[in-house]
Every structure is written in C-alpha cells, then in structure tokens.
C-alpha cells in the first residue's frame, strides 16, 4: 500500500487511492481494515497529491497551449490564457515542484531499505509541503479564474510572495525570478535595439498612443465666468497646466509607443517605466533613420554589450532589486539622453530652430508680419475660397522679399494654411479617416480669411521628436492670437493716420467721441501687445534658452520646452476662457470701429453716429468686465500673469480712476 501511496502522490492514482475531478485524490471507502485515524492521515497526504496533480495539469495545459499559439495568435474575444509570461510561470512552478518529486524518490529508497517504516514517516517527510502547496495553489487559481495576463502575472506572484511563511516566500520568489527572465529579455530588445518583442501584448509598453487626447481638453466647454471672479476649475487650470502629453514623443511617420500602466507591476515605479519607454523610442527612432545617414556609431555609443551584460547580471539575481534595476536603467537613459542632446543642440542647431519658431510662430520678425498684413489685408477680408491659400502664400513670399528675408533654405519649410468651408469635405473624399479629426464637429464657415489663417512648418529630423504635430498645433493657436492682436494694433494706427490727415479741419462733438474712443482702444491694445511680447514671449524665451544651455540632457530640454509652451498658453490667457473671450470681444469691437472710420472719412451721419454709440457702450462694458476679472484674481494672489497685465493697463491708475471703464463718455 505504501508504494500505491507514493504512486498516487506522484500523480498516478490507483484502486486504493482514487481520483475524482471534483474532490481530488481520496482513500477508497472499500477498505474496512483501515482505522479512521489512518484514513485521516492518508487523506491529509492525498491533499498534497491532489494539488500536485492539478499543478502538473496546469503546467501541461498552458505550456502546450502557448506552444500551439506561437503560430496562431489568439483572436480577440477568445479570452484564453496564453503568453510567454504564463509559460515562464509554468517553468518556475515546475522547478518549485522538483523538491517534492525528489522527496518521493527518497521515501521510496527508504521504504525499500526498511519495510517497517510507517505512514507517519511519510507524513513527517512531506509535512514541509503542507503549507507550500495550498499557498501556491491560491496563485494558480487566481491566474486561471481572473485570466491574469502578461506582466500582471509578475504583480500577482509578487503580492503573494510578501507573506510571512519562509518556504512559501522562497518558492514564489523562485517563480518570480523565472518570470523576470522574460521581462529582462524584452527589456534588452527594447532598450538596446528598439525592438518591441511582444506578440501577445504582455509587456508594459505598447505600440500606439495612450487613450485620451489633449484636444478634447482644450475644446471642452465650460460655463462662462460671472463678473465676480473665476470658477474653481479655471483656477486649477491656471495653477496646474500640464499641456504637453508625454506620450506625444514621435511624429506620426514613426511608430508611436506608450505605457500600458494597468499591467505595470507595482514594484516598478511609473517614473522608471517612462525612462524605459524614452530609451526604446529614442533607439528605435535613431535606428530607423541611421540607414539614411552617413554618421557612424549608435545612440548608445557602442555600449550595447556592456548594457546587455548589466541586464543579464540583473536577470541572474535571485531577488529583484529596484535600486540596482533603476541604476542600470538610469545609466542607459543618461547615455541616450546625452547623445540626443548632442545630436539636437550641436548637430541639428536646436537654438537656431527655436529662433525660427520665435520669428514666425511668435511674430519675432515683426517687420515681416507688418508687411504681410498690409499686403494681404484686402485679400483676407472676405470668406476664403480654394485659391486663397495660394494667393496668401504668394503675398507672404513678397512680404519676405520686401523686408530682405531671402533665406532659400527656410522659406520653403514655411507654409500659410487656410481652412475654408469645402476643404474638409474634399479631404474626406480623397482619403479614409483613421483617427477622429478635431474638425469632425460641425462648425461655421470662417467669416474671413483672417479667421481661417494658420501656419505650418516642416520640421527636420531629428527635431520632430521635440516639435511634434501636437506641439506645432499649440504654436499655431498662439500664432493666430498674436497675429489678431497685431492686426488690430495696425488698424488702430491707420485710423490715427487718418485722424492726423484731417486735424486741420473743423471737428464736431461726434469726432471728439470717435477719436477719444480710438485713443482708449489703442491704449488697451498697445499695452496688451507690450505685455504679450515683453512680459510673456521674451521673458519665457530667455528662460528656455538659459535652461537649454545649462544642461546636457535631452529629457531636461524636452521638459523645459513643454514648460515654455505651457506658460505661453497660460500667460497669454488662451486657456482661461473668461479673459480670452473678453479680449476677443474687445478686439472685435476695435475691428468694427476701424471699419466704421475707414468707410466714413468725413463727419459721421446719423446712422454712423448710432453705430459709434453702440461701439462706445460695448467697449465700455467689455473693458469694465476685463478690469473686474483682473482685479478679482489679483486680490487673491492666485495668478501673477493677470496681475501683470493689470499693471500694464493701469500703470498710472487712470483705469482705476475711470471706475475700471474705458471709452465711456457722453455723446
């Protein structure tokens, strides 16, 4: 019977020890000569046999299942367990069962040498597994019932290995070490060669962007501000502007990758995973382009063998050490970041590219855009058509020649764009839409060419990892805003020129109202322009250049640039809808005023006087609203940018003494 017991414990039940799929291994009830206490001891041993049989079934089923799946990946929706992490778990589980198998062999030798040994000896010899097997079975059952997949297996095993039972902890740490072997192989391929070897989608890095887009945030409708102040959400936006998505690292021409945070093991922090993501993306970007480049070497400075050896050393460690792991990742990341810094700052002239961005997107070349506004003024007053874009670019080239900007390498990279009513429909007809566009929501056709004007810039490799399409789109938003302010300023200056031409003629009360309103409008717009150019653009740009020159790390540059762009959008109030809406209303009133003056060079008739009265009231109301918004926030010390704009507008307390209202006087 002892041999029958050893066979049953090895996974081969017989007539004495029977197997039932539901209840497992049990002593047969057909033996009356067995004492109840003996039956109890034997059934206790049978629980070990039950667990062992289920372990071996699990190993055979899923190891074989994985091998079959290599050539036939599972269809989505099948939901079966599969993957190389599962196979590694089975391998580790098999190694943990080896001492149990050896104990049975030793018992067999002992019984052959001494036939008088009792069942109690078997019970004593196998007692060490009575704690181990149920604990490991909990892990196996959890993997099966919850269909745990990929790196989630690491998390499950790790959590159960944190218990206080030494044999259980030791066994699960062995299994975890085998599973980590798979992770280190994937890490080596990703970090050293830019290869994502992940057929079953098990790794914590995936191809494709993460869910959620910034455009949804930017276009989210919020309730407008009451006169009293700002909403809590708007204040949070001001205090915590994180506008650049970390995952938008690569241009669409290259594969995009992102973190799959939901399966990242808890003992690997997200900050370390982001470093791993950055290294792999950078290596892949460099490898993809290296074929076309004459430069020799690699982004890892030919240290692949050294780093591979360090990762292999980590793989050989019986216990995972986050300190050692992060040190190796940091060394690889530092090498990559320094190489990228050299590539971008020294070889690709990043500072020169930023100067181009500032000159064109941020209107640094003011004389160019002044000439362009004069040239294209009449062309863009009407709603755009299919030929407007071509005409505008011709005007832009002519303006560049007028101001002696004849850089043959630069101008072809810049292109003014016009979004006219039929453009999206044509694009839809010619190409399938893969990604929901920002323009899918029905919008009104632009009222003028100015409203539809944008700027595009062809970014050269490798600067595309810094100036992504999402980043350039944000620059475009700033460009449109700055151009609208500059255009209003130019129109008000033109009105002043008209006023000077007629100053020798007799004027009436309406003329006094008209020119005083122009003076107040120019005062507000000039100070807004000064605030944007000096307090925002020049200040932030000089900080950006200082940060770039004080580091040799690409990630630091990228974060500094992200911060720069975030500050531009925040400090120019593009994201603070109450202020932005109020400023736009003021600019629209200025446009209307300039149109009225240009069309009525002489004294205003009754209809013109009525229009002027409406403009005076509107400007008075909007300037009052702006003053109240700026004052309410300033009093709470929440936003220094609003306080700075108020300082520019109210530097001599005229605004305050006028009751926070400009342009309000009797007709």
Swiss-Prot record:
An MF annotation (GO) of this entry: gamma-tubulin binding
Chief subcellular location: cytoplasm
GO BP of this protein: microtubule nucleation
InterPro entries assigned to the protein according to its UniProt record, in alphabetical order: GCP (IPR007259), GCP_C (IPR040457), GCP_C_sf (IPR042241), GCP_N (IPR041470)
A GO CC term assigned to this protein in UniProt: microtubule
Subcellular location: Cytoplasm, Cytoskeleton, Microtubule organizing center, Centrosome
Keyword Oxidoreductase included in the entry's annotation: no
Region of interest called Disordered, as start-end residue ranges on this chain: 424-446
Keywords: Cytoplasm, Cytoskeleton, Microtubule
Superkingdom of source: Eukaryota
Record-linked PANTHER family: GAMMA TUBULIN COMPLEX PROTEIN (PTHR19302), GAMMA-TUBULIN COMPLEX COMPONENT 4 (PTHR19302:SF27)
Family (UniProt): Belongs to the TUBGCP family.
Subunit relationships: Component of the gamma-tubulin ring complex (gTuRC) consisting of TUBGCP2, TUBGCP3, TUBGCP4, TUBGCP5 and TUBGCP6 and gamma-tubulin TUBG1 or TUBG2. TUBGCP2, TUBGCP3, TUBGCP4, TUBGCP5 and TUBGCP6 assemble in a 5:5:2:1:1 stoichiometry; each is associated with a gamma-tubulin, thereby arranging 14 gamma-tubulins in a helical manner. Gamma-tubulin at the first position is blocked by TUBGCP3 at the last position, allowing 13 protafilaments to grow into a microtubule.
Function: Component of the gamma-tubulin ring complex (gTuRC) which mediates microtubule nucleation. The gTuRC regulates the minus-end nucleation of alpha-beta tubulin heterodimers that grow into microtubule protafilaments, a critical step in centrosome duplication and spindle formation.
The protein's name in its UniProt record: Gamma-tubulin complex component 4
């Amino acid at each position: 019977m002892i041999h029958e017991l050893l066979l049953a414990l090895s996974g081969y039940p017989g007539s004495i020890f029977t197997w039932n799929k539901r209840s497992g291994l049990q002593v047969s009830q057909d033996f009356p000569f067995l004492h109840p206490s003996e039956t109890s001891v034997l059934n206790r041993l049978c629980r070990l046999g039950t667990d062992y049989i289920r372990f071996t079934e699990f190993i055979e089923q899923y190891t074989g299942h994985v091998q079959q799946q290599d050539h036939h990946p599972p269809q989505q929706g099948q939901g079966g367990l599969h993957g190389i992490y599962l196979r590694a778990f089975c391998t580790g589980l098999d190694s943990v069962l080896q001492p149990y198998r050896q104990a049975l062999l030793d018992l067999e030798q002992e019984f052959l040498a001494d036939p008088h040994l009792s069942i109690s000896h078997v019970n004593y010899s196998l007692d060490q597994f009575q704690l181990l097997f149920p604990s490991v079975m909990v892990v196996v059952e959890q993997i099966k019932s919850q269909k745990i997949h990929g790196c989630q297996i690491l998390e499950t095993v790790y959590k159960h290995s944190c218990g206080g039972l030494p044999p259980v902890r030791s066994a699960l740490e062995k299994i975890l070490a085998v599973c980590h072997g798979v992770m280190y192989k994937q890490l080596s391929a990703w970090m050293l060669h830019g290869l994502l070897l992940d057929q079953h989608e098990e790794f914590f890095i995936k191809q494709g962007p993460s869910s959620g887009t910034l455009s949804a945030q930017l276009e989210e409708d919020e309730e407008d501000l009451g006169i009293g102040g700002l909403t809590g959400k708007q204040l949070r936006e001001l205090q915590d502007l994180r506008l650049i998505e970390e995952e938008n690292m690569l241009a669409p021409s290259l594969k995009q990758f992102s973190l799959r945070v939901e399966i990242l093991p808890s003992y690997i922090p997200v900050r370390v995973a982001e470093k791993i993501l950055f290294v792999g993306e950078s290596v892949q970007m460099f490898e993809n382009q290296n074929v076309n480049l004459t430069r020799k070497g690699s982004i890892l400075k030919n240290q692949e063998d050294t780093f591979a050896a360090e990762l292999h050393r980590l793989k050989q460690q019986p216990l995972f050490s986050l300190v050692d792991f992060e040190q190796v990742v940091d060394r690889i990341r530092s090498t990559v970041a320094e190489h990228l810094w050299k590539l971008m700052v020294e070889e690709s002239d990043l500072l020169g590219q930023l100067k181009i961005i500032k000159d064109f997107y941020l209107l640094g070349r003011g004389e160019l855009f002044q000439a362009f506004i004069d040239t294209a003024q009449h062309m863009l007053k009407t709603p755009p058509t299919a030929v407007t874009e071509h005409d505008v670019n011709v005007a832009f080239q002519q303006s560049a020649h007028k101001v002696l900007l004849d850089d043959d390498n630069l101008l072809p990279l810049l292109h003014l764009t016009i979004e006219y009513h039929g453009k999206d429909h044509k694009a839809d007809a010619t190409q399938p839409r893969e990604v929901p566009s920002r323009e899918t929501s029905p919008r009104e056709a632009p009222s003028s060419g100015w409203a539809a004007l944008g700027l595009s810039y062809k970014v050269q490799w490798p600067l595309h990892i810094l100036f992504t399409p999402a980043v350039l789109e944000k620059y475009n938003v700033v460009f449109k805003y700055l151009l609208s302010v500059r255009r209003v300023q130019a129109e008000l200056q033109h009105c002043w020129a008209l006023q000077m031409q007629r100053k020798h003629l007799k004027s009436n009360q309406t003329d006094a109202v008209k020119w005083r309103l122009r003076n107040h409008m120019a005062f507000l717009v000039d100070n807004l322009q000064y605030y944007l150019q000096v307090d925002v653009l020049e200040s932030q740009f000089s900080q950006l250049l200082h940060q770039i020159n004080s580091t040799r790390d690409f990630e630091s540059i990228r974060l500094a640039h992200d911060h720069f762009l975030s500050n531009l959008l925040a400090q120019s109030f593009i994201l603070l809808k109450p202020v932005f809406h109020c400023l736009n209303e003021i600019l629209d009133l200025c446009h209307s005023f300039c149109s009225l003056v240009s069309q009525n060079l002489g004294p205003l008739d009754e209809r013109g006087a009525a229009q002027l009265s409406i403009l005076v009231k509107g400007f008075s109301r909007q300037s009052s609203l702006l003053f109240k918004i700026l004052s309410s926030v300033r009093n709470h010390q929440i936003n220094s940018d609003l306080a700075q704009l108020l300082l520019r507008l109210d530097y001599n307390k005229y605004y305050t003494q006028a009751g926070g209202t400009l342009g309000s006087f009797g007709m």
